[in-house]
């Protein structure tokens, strides 16, 4: 029956065309000829839709409907780290074969718009990881439909999709991601509808040369894949495209890394100030600690609240530890300075001089010599004894204290051994940390994790 109907359509169309050609002259087609062509294709479309049921898929009960797809990306981006999503603008193409739409006519391809698409069966394709999808309708629905004479259809539409992009931020901001775009049939299992890529994997998804709309990422490329997803209603074919992104580090070097490095260097300037400069060293320590706190808070604002530490978090934490250690170092030096002992073993408190004993002893507000003489009484009795008494009288002598070699006085510009050690140890350790940090993360291969789709 299908063959007879197709043959009658073919003969009828050619009869009309030959009848119009019999009276035409060579040159531009007349208005009557154009009107006749319009009538021919109108009749063809009417006959195609006569008895057509768009509720039934092609090959129902006979075969599996194969839908071939490919994607042309006109715009990719932006990518939101906070919401873990990206936006993509595509021309989404689907092709399948419907024997009910075979025709014979003067043209091998019927080029139609969206009005015809609503009257025939089309795949119920949806995006598994799409948060919001928009079909453009200005000024008319951006849809294209082409029907070839053997019943093969090409259905193209322009879509803007906002899709999920699971991100693993352990290496942030030296991280890389594979953002998936997953689509498939919503109602038909793989026993009814299967999806295939139209071309080889390298050409099935193409990004326009000027299609990147990314400020913080580089689009490295894309890969395609397909798989089967098991759900409670059956097994479904899922087509997946991964867009591989690598983050640009320049913004974060300027906004976070350089300020952190400069803050650590500034905190180490206090080691070169003398230990008696308490106000200056206190200002250095407190200011740098507060600066690091502000930098750590601002660096986290642009990221989602993840439960693990990122590479930037580790860098900020180590810088914070260096700054805080510099403040503790000054507190330690100041503590020993106040106690009067420097770490070089010299006393800061000067030694008090010893008192010289006075040979006179004060008694009852009068001074008396330590050796009492009774010369006047003896002189009255015997002049000889008086002479002996005078000679026996001990005259007091001044006792001089023992002299010790003077110790070198402590100057106000003295340097503690802790400061001397810190001037070398802190910059050396911070330089080693930076060398290990940047060598580790910059040479690490991107870990692109693509979770298995599910429904």
From Swiss-Prot:
Pfam families: Neur_chan_LBD, Neur_chan_memb. It catalyses: chloride(in) = chloride(out). It is found in: Postsynaptic cell membrane; Cell membrane; Cytoplasmic vesicle membrane. The chain crosses the membrane at residues 253-273, 279-300, 311-332, 421-440. GO terms for cellular component: chloride channel complex; cytoplasmic vesicle membrane; dendritic spine; GABA-A receptor complex; GABA-ergic synapse; plasma membrane; postsynaptic specialization membrane. Gene3D superfamilies: Neurotransmitter-gated ion-channel ligand-binding domain (2.70.170.10), Neurotransmitter-gated ion-channel transmembrane domain (1.20.58.390). Expressed in the cerebellum. Residues 1-27 form the signal peptide. Keywords: Cell membrane, Chloride, Chloride channel, Cytoplasmic vesicle, Disulfide bond, Glycoprotein, Ion channel, Ion transport, Ligand-gated ion channel, Membrane, Postsynaptic cell membrane, Receptor, Signal, Synapse, Transmembrane, Transmembrane helix, Transport. Residues 28-252, 301-310, 441-455 are extracellular. GO terms for biological process: chloride transmembrane transport; gamma-aminobutyric acid signaling pathway; inhibitory synapse assembly; synaptic transmission, GABAergic. Disulfide bonds join 165-179. CDD domains: LGIC_ECD_GABAAR_A1 (cd19034), LGIC_TM_GABAAR_alpha (cd19052). Glycosylated. Glycans are attached at residues 37, 137. One of its GO terms (molecular function) is GABA-A receptor activity. Alpha subunit of the heteropentameric ligand-gated chloride channel gated by Gamma-aminobutyric acid (GABA), a major inhibitory neurotransmitter in the brain. GABA-gated chloride channels, also named GABA(A) receptors (GABAAR), consist of five subunits arranged around a central pore and contain GABA active binding site(s) located at the alpha and beta subunit interface(s). When activated by GABA, GABAARs selectively allow the flow of chloride anions across the cell membrane down their electrochemical gradient. Alpha-1/GABRA1-containing GABAARs are largely synaptic. Belongs to the ligand-gated ion channel (TC 1.A.9) family. Gamma-aminobutyric acid receptor (TC 1.A.9.5) subfamily. GABRA1 sub-subfamily. The extracellular domain contributes to synaptic contact formation. This is Gamma-aminobutyric acid receptor subunit alpha-1. It comes from Mus musculus (Mouse). The gene is Gabra1.
